[in-house]
A protein has these predicted regions:
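An extended, acidic, His-containing surface patch that forms the Zn2+-binding/catalytic region
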Residues: 1-66, 70-74, 82-95, 103, ...
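Active-site helix-to-loop segments that bind/position phosphate- or nucleotide-bearing substrates
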Residues: 79
Length: 213
């Protein structure tokens, strides 16, 4: 990403530390992960969960239904920025405008889409509630859970953290091959049973008392 306003200034050390234990792999039977994808110099986990990514959702040039052997007069693209905490969303379009103008593309028009935007949120992995949840799940499951400071997708978590001022910890119950948002989306019964045990243990420990913050 060439526009500085499109990325955070850095990845916090606490985030880097927990992401060092995360291994991002492709699903069985799925496409291989492109080794050159994402920001150079970052690990694959840091690229997904600690940095921003600019995607081309759709692109059209000329008339696809009636292509001709000529340079088309116009092109159109729908872009999407997957961003993390530390990016000022109000500064995105002005920064892109300056970037295009500086490189001789003042004639290119830009504008926001009509889609809603989720504000990025992140729980500090060093927060006492995070360690409380990790300890509880470890006791119940018998192994330490993976810790993600935030997800790589879109969630309306800002409603809880920014509007209501709450501390949030998500405990998902799924697995990589669940085909989420795709045909045959599913979850094995064993994972549901495991999730019930984990949450029962977590709520039991919460009832025993939370750490003071």
């Amino acid at each position: 990403i060439r526009v500085p306003d499109f990325v955070p200034k850095e990845i916090p050390s606490s985030v880097r530390r927990v992401l060092a234990d995360i291994e991002v792999t492709s699903n069985e039977g799925g496409p291989a992960i492109e080794p050159h994808w994402g920001e150079p110099g970052l690990t694959l986990a840091e690229k997904v969960f600690g940095w921003c990514n600019l995607e081309v959702l759709a692109f059209e040039c000329g008339n696809p239904k009636a292509p001709v052997n000529a340079i088309p007069p116009r092109a159109w693209a729908r872009m999407q920025l997957r961003f993390v905490v530390g990016v000022d969303t109000d500064a995105l379009l002005p920064a892109l405008r300056r970037h295009l103008d500086r490189h001789g593309f003042a004639h290119v028009r830009i504008g926001p889409s009509r889609d809603d935007m989720f504000i990025a949120t992140r729980m500090d992995p060093d927060h006492p509630y995070v360690q409380f949840a990790v300890d509880s799940l470890t006791r119940t499951y018998g192994a330490k859970p993976a810790i993600l400071p935030n997800l790589g997708g879109s969630l309306p978590n800002d409603i809880f953290t920014e509007v209501l001022g709450l501390t949030t910890i998500w405990v998902p119950h799924s697995y990589p091959a669940c085909s989420q948002h795709a045909p045959n989306e599913h979850v094995p019964v064993t994972i549901v049973e495991e999730g019930i045990r984990l949450m029962a243990g977590l709520y039991w420990d919460i009832g025993e008392g939370l750490p003071k913050v």
